[in-house]
């Protein structure tokens, strides 16, 4: 994290003192996304839910990170669920792209990792979709909440999982437990 922040500070220092006319502006410019990410990552790390951990495989690329959610209650308690997040160049006008890397039996996450979470949608009919005022903290808290209060059987992406829950809650729980033992340890 400090590497990109150091780069931003260095670049800010170069603004007033252009030493070479041959140096292009593009080598000095830092994207709006990257400036926002330095601030948001610091805020995120200070305000993570206790059930979440963030990992940056490359500290110079704050736009690519992994999130681990380890629910401490509900159906998914005891599992560790990995999410991959990529923040596009057009951030914060568009939401980050998030995929669940852990196979899971969940009404709002497909077995291939697609996620149904309003704030990850650029356009949402319920008015809770992405807005430029949202931050990575909102995304992380939203993903964490998919395992508790945002678990939604009434508006599923994985219809089969939602119908399974409706048909037989105990068997649904058994299948969730099986997936946790097999894929989320």
Swiss-Prot record:
Pathway: Protein modification; protein neddylation. The keyword Acetylation applies. Keywords: Acetylation, ATP-binding, Nucleotide-binding, Transferase, Ubl conjugation pathway. Widely expressed (at protein level). It holds the Pfam family UQ_con. SUPFAM superfamilies: UBC-like. The active site is at 116 (glycyl thioester intermediate). GO terms for molecular function: ATP binding; NEDD8 conjugating enzyme activity; NEDD8 transferase activity. Residues 32-185 form the UBC core domain. It catalyses: [E1 NEDD8-activating enzyme]-S-[NEDD8 protein]-yl-L-cysteine + [E2 NEDD8-conjugating enzyme]-L-cysteine = [E1 NEDD8-activating enzyme]-L-cysteine + [E2 NEDD8-conjugating enzyme]-S-[NEDD8-protein]-yl-L-cysteine. The modification N-acetylmethionine is found at residue 1. CDD domains: UBCc_UBE2F_UBE2M. One of its GO terms (biological process) is protein neddylation. It is an enzyme of class 2 (transferase). Its EC number is 2.3.2.34. It comes from the Eukaryota. Residues 1-29 are annotated as: Interaction with UBA3. The keyword Acetylation applies. Accepts the ubiquitin-like protein NEDD8 from the UBA3-NAE1 E1 complex and catalyzes its covalent attachment to other proteins. Together with the E3 ubiquitin ligase RNF7/RBX2, specifically neddylates cullin-5 (CUL5). Does not neddylate CUL1, CUL2, CUL3, CUL4A or CUL4B. Mediates neddylation of the CUL9-RBX1 complex. Belongs to the ubiquitin-conjugating enzyme family. UBE2F subfamily. This is NEDD8-conjugating enzyme UBE2F. The gene is Ube2f.
């Amino acid at each position: 994290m400090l590497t990109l922040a150091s780069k931003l500070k260095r670049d800010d220092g170069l603004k007033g003192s252009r030493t070479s006319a041959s140096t292009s502006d593009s080598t000095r410019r830092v994207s709006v996304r990257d400036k926002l990410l330095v601030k948001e990552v610091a805020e995120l790390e200070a305000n993570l839910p206790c059930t979440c951990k963030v990992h940056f495989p490359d500290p110079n690329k704050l736009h690519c990170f992994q999130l681990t959610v380890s629910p401490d209650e509900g159906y998914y308690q005891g599992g560790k669920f990995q999410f991959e997040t990529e923040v596009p160049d057009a951030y914060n006008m568009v939401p980050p792209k998030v995929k669940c890397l852990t196979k899971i039996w969940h009404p709002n996450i497909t077995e291939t990792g697609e996620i149904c979470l309003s704030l990850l949608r650029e356009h949402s009919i319920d008015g809770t979709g992405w807005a430029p005022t949202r931050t990575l903290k909102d995304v992380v808290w939203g993903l964490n909440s998919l395992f508790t209060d945002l678990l939604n059987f009434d508006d599923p992406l994985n219809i089969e999982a939602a119908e399974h829950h409706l048909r037989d809650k105990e068997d649904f729980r058994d299948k969730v437990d099986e997936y946790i033992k097999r894929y989320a340890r």
